[in-house]
């Protein structure tokens, strides 16, 4: 839930990234967040994940949040992929026994082969992103926040990612999805929030939201 939300970046004189945003998102909803660059989409997601806090107002979040934002954030380049699974788990507040339970699922999903026991500094950027994605979608989050993360990997891995997201949605979890792919938003989300210059200009049916957004861009 967002209540009278404002956010002003440091050193900003007049610019507000978000202006008087009030929203309620229910458990189990899948919601697309659309808008041009600079509309406030990423700022909103960062507030939900606790990375950023509002200048005024408050954000109430219930449950465990997994964020597919900066997928490689928190990785140690000198540690192996396997060790980074635990490191990332600790950062997310998970216990050893729980990380051990999901370790094999993460490794299988990431498809890194023997590289899982090699230092992450030897990974390509795509391999790091796959590992980050695999960790976040396998921790059984109550709320999954996605910012263009479905563009990770090749065609086969993208399909695998989409199937996993569909599985999470089917299980009754809440999904917030930011994307510039209108088809992607329509496929995943029945509801969409259209942000424009930090304000919510539409909140409702995804097709209406996308039609309004497309019309504004003409």
Give each language-model segment a name.
Residues 1-19, 206-218:
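Pre-NBD coupling/linker segments of ABC/ABC-like ATPases
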Residues 185-187:
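A short, surface-exposed alpha-helical micro-motif characterized by mixed small hydrophobic
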Residues 34-36:
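The feature captures the beta-strand-to-loop junction immediately N-terminal to the Walker
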Residues 179-180:
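H-loop/switch region of ABC-family ATPase nucleotide-binding domains
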Residues 1-5, 86, 98-115:
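Conserved ABC ATPase "signature" region
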Residues 197-198, 213:
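Conserved ABC ATPase "signature" C-loop
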């Amino acid at each position: 839930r967002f209540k009278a939300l404002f956010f002003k970046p440091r050193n900003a004189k007049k610019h507000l990234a978000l202006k008087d945003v009030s929203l309620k998102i229910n458990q189990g909803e899948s919601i697309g967040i659309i808008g041009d660059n600079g509309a406030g989409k990423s700022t909103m997601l960062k507030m939900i994940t606790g990375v950023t806090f509002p200048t005024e107002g408050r954000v109430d979040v219930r449950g465990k949040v997994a964020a597919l934002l900066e997928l490689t954030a928190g990785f140690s380049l000198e540690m192996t992929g396997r060790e980074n699974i635990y490191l990332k788990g600790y950062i997310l507040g998970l216990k050893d026994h729980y990380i051990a339970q999901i370790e094999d699922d993460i490794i299988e999903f990431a498809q890194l082969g023997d590289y899982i026991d090699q230092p992450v500094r030897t990974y390509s950027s795509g391999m790091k992103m796959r590992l980050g994605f695999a960790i976040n979608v396998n921790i059984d989050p109550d709320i999954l926040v996605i910012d263009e993360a479905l563009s990770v990997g090749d065609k086969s891995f993208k399909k695998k990612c989409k199937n996993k997201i569909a599985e999470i949605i089917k299980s009754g979890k809440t999904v917030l999805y930011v994307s510039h792919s209108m088809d992607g938003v329509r496929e995943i989300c029945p509801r969409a929030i259209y942000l424009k210059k930090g304000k919510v200009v539409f909140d409702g049916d995804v097709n209406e939201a996308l039609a309004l957004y497309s019309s504004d861009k003409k």
